[in-house]
Amino acid sequence: MAERVVLAYSGGLDTSVGIGWLKDATGKEVVALAVDVGQGGEDMEVIRQRALDCGAVEAVVVDAKDEFADDYIVPALKANALYQKRYPLVSGLSRPLIAKHLARVAHELGANSVAHGCTGKGNDQVRFEAAVAALAPDLTSIAPVRDLALTRDKAIVYANEHDLPIEQSKKSPYSIDKNVWGRAVETGFLEDPWNGPIEDLYEYTQDPDVLRDATEVTITFEAGVPVAIDGVRYSPLRIVQELNAAAGAHGIGRIDVVEDRLVGIKSREVYEAPAAMTLIEAHEELESLTIERDLGRYKRGVEKDWANLVYDGLWFSGLKRSLDAFIEDSQRHVSGDIRMTLRGGRAVVTGRRSESSLYDFDLATYDTGDTFDQSLSKGFIELWSLPSKISARRDLAVEQAALAADPAPAAE
């Protein structure tokens, strides 16, 4: 039996041509694996058949939408994950899931290697290969686009020469990646960071400058997990889908950013993530109601580290697992409802409530019924500021001693 390689297959130009390139370069049979993470577009059966028509000996399709939402999006939401405070890890979350299925299918079918269609300039090559190395160190990773210096022009020529069933042209300069958590667009005229994005660039969101009647939604969380919209319970996947539609209609979740890639360069990216940005805003607001101050402060540092690890392709690392444990414990009381108004590109919180709330009305009110004993504040302030007072006295004494030992020269 010939050796096999399992290719992460998207149905696009690079991975369709990659089937033939892999066969020619390695002599191995190519198994195509297409993973549905909610990217939409073509039917997965059409993609499966295209892989076979392009020369794959077998094509496997995995519906991983619910798995993606439950096991990748939900942890990211609990972590309020935003790389460099802006990017909700659209691609960074899907790559370890795809890599997991690459490793699984490779072992099930007796393949000794896996492959992907990433270039040598991006983050995804690292994410795929680091994940495979962590899950299946016996497998080798092949990157034909990177390792064989295969350009888009060469891919188009190859596709035409071999009559591959794909329609591609040089007129589409963008590189696009999308899943149910968001959509990423790069290259083309966006490579000049002075060029503003045009409206035709967007797919998940409507123009936020075209005002529509506001939409009000109430999102319910249980232990950090979104479980309902307006009192109707849904799966995490369905909640993301519903909010993509509702928030996207108001242009919420558009992000235009220059970010630092893992490989050492800066890259201009445009993202659309209506559900992601709405849910993160709601989740953060509920945490402000239910998490004590010190835990919240510390968690913000953990959130940054968590997002960096995932962005850098270390989903399966020991540190990531340890941070997961901390974040999971922090969510025990993050249950309740957040009411939001969606309009004009913004998701604005207008109400919050929780049976686990740390907000005590009787302590917070300035009206009759106030139970806060203000007489205790004077002593609290005295003790709280005592270290600063002692330090200031010390500094003043040292300064005075220095002046006494070395007085300023008398003026002539």
Swiss-Prot record:
Family: Belongs to the argininosuccinate synthase family. Type 1 subfamily.
Binding-site positions, ATP: A8, Y9, S10, G11, G12, L13, D14, T15, S16, G117
EC assignment: 6.3.4.5
GO terms for biological process, alphabetical: argininosuccinate metabolic process; L-arginine biosynthetic process; urea cycle
Domain of life the protein comes from: Bacteria
Protein name, per record: Argininosuccinate synthase
Catalytic EC class: ligase
Keyword DNA damage: no
Single GO term (MF): argininosuccinate synthase activity
Annotated positions binding L-aspartate: T119, N123, D124
Cellular location(s): Cytoplasm
